Regions:
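Histidine-centered catalytic micro-motifs
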Residues: 101-111, 175-184, 240-246
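Active-site HxH/HxHxD metal-binding segment of metal-dependent hydrolases
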Residues: 63, 70-171, 194-195, 264
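Accessory terminal helices/loops
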Residues: 19, 26-39, 130, 225-238, ...
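Active-site-adjacent loop/tail segments of enzyme domains
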Residues: 208-234
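Active-site metal-binding loops of divalent metal-dependent hydrolases
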Residues: 68-70, 106, 130-131, 180-181, ...
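N-terminal amphipathic/basic-hydrophobic helices that include classical n-h-c signal peptides
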Residues: 1-30
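Core dinuclear metal-dependent hydrolase active-site scaffold
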Residues: 40-43, 54, 162-192, 232
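Conserved beta-strand hairpin/beta-sheet module of binuclear metal-dependent hydrolase folds
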Residues: 33-97, 187-200
Length: 325
């Protein structure tokens, strides 16, 4: 694939427009227009505190879906597509066509609906090229079936750092921002000089801090450098979160700005040096339990949202490696 030219960044544009959709308790979408044609819908999954996005070029109606959720009941071992179906309904409402089904990384706290969305809506599944590292580590941990490829081929496109792509007429760029996992990517999208970055699990809202760094292949020092790269964008750049944990019981928030993160992020505001951050992050990570859904999530997500291959009885099974995490 040819790489798109890196878009220019202009700062003399009016502020973003944002408004909340009206609806019942299950209508948690938020809508934002950035620049002239960058439309962002945010969908909050209360069960996993995950925020999924529909990002659309209003001119061409072409869109990308970012970090979707496949609902999973660990007690019953059952999946459900209710969260993903909300995305499908919104795509239909907007009369949009799906170009991309993007994953910022192999999530450890929710299952991805990428395979289901591609089946229903089309589009190309994409993730960072370092997915192969994650597949090798977790393919071994779960003793994956011989047919499980560790080359990222479950995804349609493996994005390299600084690789450009388009969503309709919108310029987008992949940024390798490892630390939480070795394969984490952020997605920068620009329109009319306004910049939006979908940061995955690097930063959280300023009152919650940063992502953990105790998974295989994770590294706190690497995360610090990735975050500083994100915070090098202009002050007014919008940063879109992948999770919000509602500290103190506040309302859900799904975006912040570079300026707000620099000024008040409790873990990595301006003035916190690399060694201090690493010491804090490593000490904090020692106190954290594993995510409730890490074992099912990783097995599904390293396969681009597909369940493990069915066994001879036609049933897919998830494994529990004992005493390994």
């Amino acid at each position: 694939r040819k790489r798109a030219a890196k878009p220019g960044m202009h700062l003399d544009k009016p502020p973003v427009t944002a408004y909340a959709l009206q609806g019942g308790a299950d209508k948690l979408e938020n809508v934002m227009i950035i620049g002239n044609n960058l439309h962002v819908d945010a969908f909050y999954d209360e069960a996993t505190s995950t925020i999924s996005y529909l990002v659309m070029d209003r001119e061409t109606r072409q869109c990308a879906l970012i970090d979707s959720v496949l609902d999973y009941d660990p007690k019953a071992g059952r999946t459900c597509t209710a969260s993903a179906d909300r995305l499908i309904e919104r795509v239909t409402e907007l009369n949009a066509s799906v170009r991309w089904v993007l994953e910022t990384h192999v999530h450890a706290d929710h299952l991805s609906a990428a395979a289901y969305l591609k089946e229903k809506l089309g589009g190309h599944t994409a993730i960072g090229a370092h997915i192969t590292q994650v597949q090798k580590v977790f393919g071994a941990l779960f003793n994956a079936e011989p047919g499980f490829a560790r080359d990222g081929s479950q995804f349609d496109v493996l994005l390299e750092d600084e690789e450009g792509f388009r969503i309709g007429n919108l310029h987008a760029r992949a940024m390798h921002t490892p630390g939480h996992t070795p394969a984490c990517m952020s997605f920068m999208i620009e329109d009319a000089g306004e910049i939006a970055v979908f940061v995955g699990d690097t930063l959280f809202m300023p009152d919650y801090g940063t992502a953990r760094c105790d998974f295989p292949g994770a590294d706190a020092r690497t995360l610090y450098r990735s975050i500083r790269r994100l915070l090098a964008f202009p002050d007014q750049t919008r940063l879109f979160m992948c999770h919000d944990y509602l500290p103190g019981g506040r309302d859900m928030q799904y975006f912040t700005t570079v300026a707000e993160q620099r000024a008040s992020n409790i873990h990595i505001h301006q003035g916190i040096d690399e060694d201090s951050f690493v010491a804090m992050r490593e000490a904090r990570d020692k106190t954290l339990d594993m995510p409730v859904l890490i074992l099912p999530s990783v097995q599904v997500n390293m396969r681009s949202g597909q369940l493990p291959a069915p066994e001879e009885n036609g049933v897919s099974y998830l494994k529990i490696p004992l005493n390994k995490l």
